[in-house]
Swiss-Prot record:
Its EC number is 4.3.2.1. Pathway: Amino-acid biosynthesis; L-arginine biosynthesis; L-arginine from L-ornithine and carbamoyl phosphate: step 3/3. GO terms for biological process: arginine biosynthetic process via ornithine; L-arginine biosynthetic process. The keyword Glycoprotein does not apply. It catalyses: 2-(N(omega)-L-arginino)succinate = fumarate + L-arginine. It is an enzyme of class 4 (lyase). This is Argininosuccinate lyase. The lineage of its organism: Bacteria, Bacillati, Bacillota, Bacilli, Bacillales. It comes from Listeria monocytogenes serovar 1/2a (strain ATCC BAA-679 / EGD-e). GO terms for molecular function: argininosuccinate lyase activity. InterPro entries: Arg_succ_lyase_C, Argininosuccinate_lyase, Fumarase/histidase_N, Fumarate_lyase_CS, Fumarate_lyase_fam, Fumarate_lyase_N, L-Aspartase-like.
Amino acid sequence: MEKLWGGRFQGKSEAWIDDFGASISFDQKMAKEDLAGSLAHVAMLGKCGIIPASEAAEITAGLKILQEKLAFGELEFSTVNEDIHLNIEKLLHEEIGSVAGKLHTARSRNDQVATDMHLYLKQAVAEIIQSLKHLRVVLVQKAELHVETIMPGYTHLQHAQPLSFAHHLLAYFGMFTRDLERLEESVKRIDISPLGSAALAGTTFPIDRAYSAELLGFSAVYENSLDGVSDRDFIIEFLSNSSILMMHLSRFCEELILWTSHEFQFVELTDAFSTGSSIMPQKKNPDMAELIRGKTGRVYGNLFGMLTVLKGLPLAYNKDLQEDKEGMFDTLETVQTSLDIFAGMIETMKVNTEIMEESTQKDFSNATELADYLAKKGVPFREAHEIVGKLVLECTQNGIYLQDVALSHYQEINPLIEEDIYVVLSSKTAVQKRNSYGGTGFDQIKVALENAKKTL
């Protein structure tokens, strides 16, 4: 089959080489955007008198026919035509004849593909933003149910200090809020039109770039044509933001995996988000959480791959840039699906509140409370720290906890200790008293929830 760019060439190409160079297997995802870009471009050509209005109307009608066929899955693409742009042009030629060749006036595939990617990513990021907003709602709703649910807080995966489970959930709410802000902020760099940059230097035709940008819903145009066709920062920024978002999902999934284990039993995932074993009938595995954790590395790989492709490219277009799409498509799909599954897991999981709270009774996470108690009695904190540390060692040797120590023994250690120490050492009191701004105290959690709801 004759190539649309074949005038310069005499030799015939070979099918296996065509297959290697073709991108239609994946860039056909942008068929809708390619048709939209072409409709805007031909409208601009007609408006500016670059082609006759009658021909612009004929091309427009042909493109709309292709849009209808695309919607019904009736368009067939070929690797012979390499990419989505040449496939669309070939199909348009079959619909309306040689006038289709005028569509590419004042346009290059360089600005055409960049336009497609801006359009595609803009819509896809908008959908991810909506899913992220939904996840934040789910977290707030779950947190509201567990303001007074007590759990161990960890450092080094060792019991550190007791927390409200709501406080833990709201920590992730803060992370996902920053993810949301990053994605929303990045839209202004996606929402720029490269259309009209042509190959790299602009065009001699009297085009109106602002008009085509307006038709496509872009808020601005690239000020430099060379930058317009060369820029892939907007994709790297999306991949970077996605990597951070997936990292947050992965950290929470790691905790869910631990919490569902027999050793923890803090939560139970519903059957929909779990799988069994082919040999061990008792197993209920947190596969969806594990997959999100695993797919985080995949998203990181897409970011590093894109950075590596771009690091040595001179301006402007190079065929290497064909490698900018698959990682973007894969990341979009991975992030979208991961968000939806994760929100479902959190929304439907059962929280074993009694087991969580019991876990804080069988540890020394109240040791800081005893040290603070002594400090408030006038004992220098470092001295209090030393006293409590020795007492913890004594307790571990005797197989008891701080709340099991007799008052008489406490008073031998320091006569300032009174009977109220047992109230102080309760995990609920420990949580309730941490009412510094942003702390885990119940009053602070309620304030945090109200503030969070204002941002939903």
